[in-house]
Amino acid sequence: FIFINIFFYRISEHGTDRSAQILIFLLIIELLILINLDSHFRENSTKFFILLILIISLKSFYILYLILLFPILYYFIKDKKIIYVRDFLKNPLFYLSFLTFIFILLVNFFNSGCLIYPVKITCFENFSWTIPLQEVSQMNNWYEQWSKGGAGPNFRVDNPEIYIQKFNWVGNWITVYFFNKVSDFLYGIIFLSFILFVIFYSKNNKVEVPYKGIILIYLMLILLFTEWFYNHPALRYGGYPLIALLLFLPIAQYLSKKNYLNFNTNIRAY
């Protein structure tokens, strides 16, 4: 909540980019709840899938977040909770979410001839309305060039096809983008994390209740971060929640082991 109000305070910048990224934070919270709580499974699973579909509907490339289904399947099998799958399949909202997902793909298909535009391998070139594959590739390369710091309102790099390949772009990206936007964002979340750490830190450990899924979810986030950094390293294309969550989750896991009795007592006293 604090993060959203500090870093996403300008409503004019929200659009579909910021809104989807706010929902990603909620999605991770609901994922942890779904994995760790046996009660209210139907309600928790409903919230998770509604959030997931909403995120994908706002930006099609967030279809990559379907990878977060893996921790659910893993722990259902590991903890022998397959019985929950039956309850899940009886939930009409599951089928509504699935149909919504199919509808999103169809809308993309009828608009561009691609299931996910501008990803060339998802395009069907045999239909009359399909955008020519060369134009799809050019648009994809343009988005990649822009996100890698190779283009802006007043400049373009030479040889963009070579620039976006492998890690040729990293040096220039650090100069024109990292130290303008990413570094400020990192300073902000590190400072916010420090403030919250100081407020909630306690030397008294409490009886630890292990939270399942933290490590596996963290690995999924690292995979998503790697894909983000290699293909479209702009904060507006999913960087905000990935960077923040990679920092917040370990801190939250550490602070969850502490006893907040003294902190709560002081708050009540004031």
Describe these PLM feature segments.
Residues 91-183:
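Membrane-lumen/periplasm interface segments of specific transmembrane helices
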Residues 65-98, 254-256:
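Perimembrane helix-loop-helix junctions
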Residues 4-12, 78-79, 111, 201-205, ...:
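Juxtamembrane "helix-exit" motif on the non-cytosolic side of transmembrane helices
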Residues 22-28, 54, 65-78, 241-248:
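Hydrophobic transmembrane alpha-helices of multi-pass, membrane-embedded glycosylation machinery
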Residues 9-12, 159-217:
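Membrane-interface anchor segments at the N-terminal boundary of transmembrane helices
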Residues 1, 6-33, 238-240:
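Multi-pass, polyprenyl lipid-linked donor-dependent membrane glycosyltransferases
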Residues 1-4, 27, 47-51, 98-99, ...:
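Transmembrane alpha-helix segments characteristic
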